[in-house]
Amino acid sequence: MEHYISLLIKSIFIENMALSFFLGMCTFLAVSKKVKTSFGLGVAVVVVLTIAVPVNNLVYNLVLKENALVEGVDLSFLNFITFIGVIAALVQILEMILDRFFPPLYNALGIFLPLITVNCAIFGGVSFMVQRDYNFAESVVYGFGAGVGWMLAIVALAGIREKMKYSDVPPGLRGLGITFITVGLMALGFMSFSGVQL
């Protein structure tokens, strides 16, 4: 149990997808203008990562890994296309659920919901799972932790950006300029966790 707790904390803070690996920056910067919308997208990313990482773990270990289906057959060259297909299917299912049961959130996320399919934070989580050879339980914990870490980062940035509306930002830095500086400072803050051994 201690191993899973340390993996969860590590994936949220130490190896934060957005602020340590800078994955998923497109939606991270574009949607982080309002906390409510950021939280909604963050929840969607948590759900997709929590499901996509373990499902792709099963697909990898039962089908794609060397000697998984037949002795001497290695289908690992299909990793990328298979993982992207599974992620796309999961995002489509999530999109249909949000459209049916949460129309305001669906409308607020707009084009960024289908973009979760190509959000490199999702694919990065799946790739790290394969690279680190996580078992099924570890992949569930890692997927959830990576999603929560990304959500924490985007909600924190949205809160800061909402407060910055009332700040006297120099004209040359208004908009994305000050946002990039803010993200850099947040990343420096998260770098302080890099020396923590769990």
Curated annotation (Swiss-Prot):
Subunit organization: Composed of six subunits; NqrA, NqrB, NqrC, NqrD, NqrE and NqrF.
Keyword NAD: yes
Protein's UniProt keywords contain Cell division: no
EC code(s) of this entry: 7.2.1.1
Membrane topology qualifier: Multi-pass membrane protein
Keyword annotations of the record: Cell inner membrane, Cell membrane, Ion transport, Membrane, NAD, Sodium, Sodium transport, Translocase, Transmembrane, Transmembrane helix, Transport, Ubiquinone
Record-given protein name: Na(+)-translocating NADH-quinone reductase subunit E
Listed GO MF terms: oxidoreductase activity, acting on NAD(P)H, quinone or similar compound as acceptor
Signal peptide: none
Location in the cell: Cell inner membrane
Taxonomy of the source species: Bacteria, Pseudomonadati, Pseudomonadota, Gammaproteobacteria, Vibrionales
Function, in words: NQR complex catalyzes the reduction of ubiquinone-1 to ubiquinol by two successive reactions, coupled with the transport of Na(+) ions from the cytoplasm to the periplasm. NqrA to NqrE are probably involved in the second step, the conversion of ubisemiquinone to ubiquinol.
Stated family: Belongs to the NqrDE/RnfAE family.
Catalytically driven reaction(s): a ubiquinone + n Na(+)(in) + NADH + H(+) = a ubiquinol + n Na(+)(out) + NAD(+)
A single GO cellular-component term on record: plasma membrane
One GO biological process term: sodium ion transport
Regions crossing the membrane: 11-31, 39-59, 77-97, 110-130, 140-160, 176-196
One Pfam family, short name: Rnf-Nqr
Root EC class: translocase
Domain of life: Bacteria
